[in-house]
Amino acid sequence: MSFIDPYQHIIVEHQYSHKFTVVVLRATKVTKGTFGDMLDTPDPYVELFISTTPDSRKRTRHFNNDINPVWNETFEFILDPNQENVLEITLMDANYVMDETLGTATFPVSSMKVGEKKEVPFIFNQVTEMILEMSLEVCSCPDLRFSMALCDQEKTFRQQRKENIKENMKKLLGPKKSEGLYSTRDVPVVAILGSGGGFRAMVGFSGVMKALYESGILDCATYIAGLSGSTWYMSTLYSHPDFPEKGPEEINEELMKNVSHNPLLLLTPQKVKRYVESLWKKKSSGQPVTFTDIFGMLIGETLIQNRMSMTLSSLKEKVNAARCPLPLFTCLHVKPDVSELMFADWVEFSPYEIGMAKYGTFMAPDLFGSKFFMGTVVKKYEENPLHFLMGVWGSAFSILFNRVLGVSGSQNKGSTMEEELENITAKHIVSNDSSDSDDEAQGPKGTENEEAEKEYQSDNQASWVHRMLMALVSDSALFNTREGRAGKVHNFMLGLNLNTSYPLSPLRDFSSQDSFDDELDAAVADPDEFERIYEPLDVKSKKIHVVDSGLTFNLPYPLILRPQRGVDLIISFDFSARPSDTSPPFKELLLAEKWAKMNKLPFPKIDPYVFDREGLKECYVFKPKNPDVEKDCPTIIHFVLANINFRKYKAPGVLRETKEEKEIADFDIFDDPESPFSTFNFQYPNQAFKRLHDLMYFNTLNNIDVIKDAIVESIEYRRQNPSRCSVSLSNVEARKFFNKEFLSKPTV
């Protein structure tokens, strides 16, 4: 069924760039001067340079002993038309030791008109003539997608998934409870969320997914969103060749085996040498490399060791026929000098797209990490492997890598690991790279001789590999400092115009002082939280830092709360650390509520005092108080990590009887002095794995009726409000743009 998507009619303002094409055709009478020509015949080549654009230097091949070379080589530059762009042309002579400059010339690009194409002669040393063909055109098809709407692939997925879910819900609920499902318009959008929490979150989420799969709930979900540790399980599951034909049960058996080994086994000298040498290839190609790259390799070797070449794009085959929920992953873009609690841009990843909803900018997954300028790729690299993204999504653990491996001599002294993570800020992992220089491993300017080039590159590689090896296999500064550990990629928004930016809910009024003040009356009272969330990123910085989203709050609600996704029911699983098993479990959920309110996104009121009234439970349900008024507000079923009924029951309604059955379930999660479920435990013996896995498997199955009842209510809500999260086109026309002045924090 076709429908009108109002978000397609919101214009995301962006400036078009120019593509300047230069064809180096030929030169005649190339000379080194009378005396120079007597000693040697020139070996000419041409360098082109425009300082105002990335990937600014280009060069032709050289010809040996040729004074009339014909190159006929084409080069492209992406330019900002508002800059003073000047082409510098240098005629060079290739030599064995150091190349020689034979002459230079300049050409102002502004002298050309858009659509113009012409040949331009340049004279060097009053003798040599070089002919360049130049053309200038508008880049009308950028590589970034500028839109507030979901991409067409996700829209197609949603429609196919609704068809599948309609039948699955009828099967799950039975004919009586599903009688409101007349068409796909009545199908509610269900999302499953997993929090961060290291391997604890990953193992717990594995039990959750097994229960959801076997109960049929997973077949009724449209999305599954993860953060940090949960993304590691999602990556393991979705990259597995047998999923979704086979369920999580067999895959979880493999996972249990993989995480039972000591992580130090990944750091044998031979393996480390292989890691570092593979990263040299990335660095030498011009991409930034940080410790997060290495951490991603270690996570990949642990969890997806037989599929290290997998990419995010390759997961599309799992969801193209809408056979399973669309996986959504996340990280943060942060600034070096600002706390991530004050400023952070949420970056979302799916097999279809990567981007930032705040700016309405998205790209195909294989372009993430490539060099962009004004929305156009100026240098494309191979798609980053999935394990690199796994390192980025869980990069908080690369900060305290010595604690993860247990190589620190002080690991049992002073603060606990959870307390250390609590105190980490983006400043600990983001180096303030003021130079912002490119990372290409380049030799001296003009070096062309192959032997000299190989020797230069070999020396560079040997030095870099040696430093990394020494850092990893010894208790060096790399283990004792936290600087520069964030993931780093080329800034895909470099050169864009951010005079206009967009709230996540673009159709809501951001200019009301009263409404803003009302939102500050939230359960989490720290006034600094999210204070600068409306600020734009730095479009002049060549690279951006991407870190673990758990450093701001530990639940991936921003992915699911995008109104374009129209989610009716959210089933969230929180594996976050708590001071003790009896501590209130709502800290992260309250932060998510505050973030949602400050972004004017509908969110049910979270009452933290329900813990005082009802005590610790396996899950809590939060609904809109007035569904008739709060038509766009989702219902949330919030599962927490708690061992309550599992101690008595081995399955829902089936009591434990034997001593062994009771002992295996008699354990604490956060109060155990041995800390087997610590956030920083990266080795799970089989018993610890089974305990945590089976606990969350039980807790989920024990509350399946709660989930089913919420689905039935969501069907009714959807039936009563078929145009949920939609707006009239007249409203869209009236609100095409939101200027930054309306998005800045109101002053009192």
UniProtKB/Swiss-Prot annotation:
Pathway named in the protein's UniProt entry: Membrane lipid metabolism; glycerophospholipid metabolism; Lipid metabolism; arachidonate metabolism; Lipid metabolism; prostaglandin biosynthesis; Lipid metabolism; leukotriene B4 biosynthesis
Binding-site residues, Ca(2+) 2: D40, D43, D93, A94, N95
Gene Ontology cellular-component terms listed: cytosol; endoplasmic reticulum; Golgi apparatus; Golgi membrane; nuclear envelope
Residues found modified as Phosphothreonine: T268
Reactions that this protein is recorded to catalyse: a 1,2-diacyl-sn-glycero-3-phosphocholine + H2O = a 1-acyl-sn-glycero-3-phosphocholine + a fatty acid + H(+); a 1-O-alkyl-2-acyl-sn-glycero-3-phosphocholine + H2O = a 1-O-alkyl-sn-glycero-3-phosphocholine + a fatty acid + H(+); a 1-acyl-sn-glycero-3-phosphocholine + H2O = sn-glycerol 3-phosphocholine + a fatty acid + H(+); 1-hexadecanoyl-2-(5Z,8Z,11Z,14Z-eicosatetraenoyl)-sn-glycero-3-phosphocholine + H2O = 1-hexadecanoyl-sn-glycero-3-phosphocholine + (5Z,8Z,11Z,14Z)-eicosatetraenoate + H(+)
Gene3D superfamilies, sorted: C2 domain, Cytosolic phospholipase A2 catalytic domain
Regulation: Activated by cytosolic calcium, which is necessary for binding to membrane lipids. Activated by phosphorylation in response to mitogenic stimuli. Stimulated by agonists such as ATP and thrombin.
Compartments (UniProt record): Cytoplasm; Golgi apparatus membrane; Nucleus envelope
Summary of the tissues where the protein is detected: Expressed in various organs including uterus, kidney, spleen, liver, heart, lung and brain (at protein level).
Annotated catalytic residues: S228, D548
Keywords: Calcium, Cytoplasm, Fatty acid biosynthesis, Fatty acid metabolism, Glycerol metabolism, Golgi apparatus, Hydrolase, Isopeptide bond, Leukotriene biosynthesis, Lipid biosynthesis, Lipid degradation, Lipid metabolism, Lipid-binding, Membrane, Metal-binding, Nucleus, Phospholipid degradation, Phospholipid metabolism, Phosphoprotein, Prostaglandin biosynthesis, Prostaglandin metabolism, Ubl conjugation
InterPro entries, per the entry: Acyl_Trfase/lysoPLipase (IPR016035), C2_cPLA2 (IPR041847), C2_dom (IPR000008), C2_domain_sf (IPR035892), LysoPLipase_cat_dom (IPR002642)
PROSITE patterns, per the entry: C2 (PS50004), PLA2C (PS51210)
Modified residue annotations for Phosphoserine: S2, S434, S435, S437, S505, S515, S726, S728
Binding site for Ca(2+) 1: D40, T41, D43, N65
Effect of deleting the gene: Mutant female mice have reduced fertility and produce small litters that most commonly result in dead pups. The pregnancy failure is likely due to a deficient implantation and parturition. In an inflammatory setting, mutant mice are protected against various pathological changes. In a bleomycin-induced model of pulmonary fibrosis, mutant mice show an attenuated lung inflammation characterized by impaired induction of eicosanoid synthesis and impaired inflammatory leukocyte migration to the lung.
Pfam families: C2 (PF00168), PLA2_B (PF01735)
Domain PLA2c: 140-739
One GO MF term attached to the UniProt entry: ceramide 1-phosphate binding
Domain topic, free-text comment: The N-terminal C2 domain associates with lipid membranes upon calcium binding. It modulates enzyme activity by presenting the active site to its substrate in response to elevations of cytosolic calcium. In the presence of phosphoinositides, regulates phospholipase A2 and lysophospholipase activities in a calcium-independent way.
Name of the protein described by the UniProt record: Cytosolic phospholipase A2
Native organism: Mus musculus (Mouse)
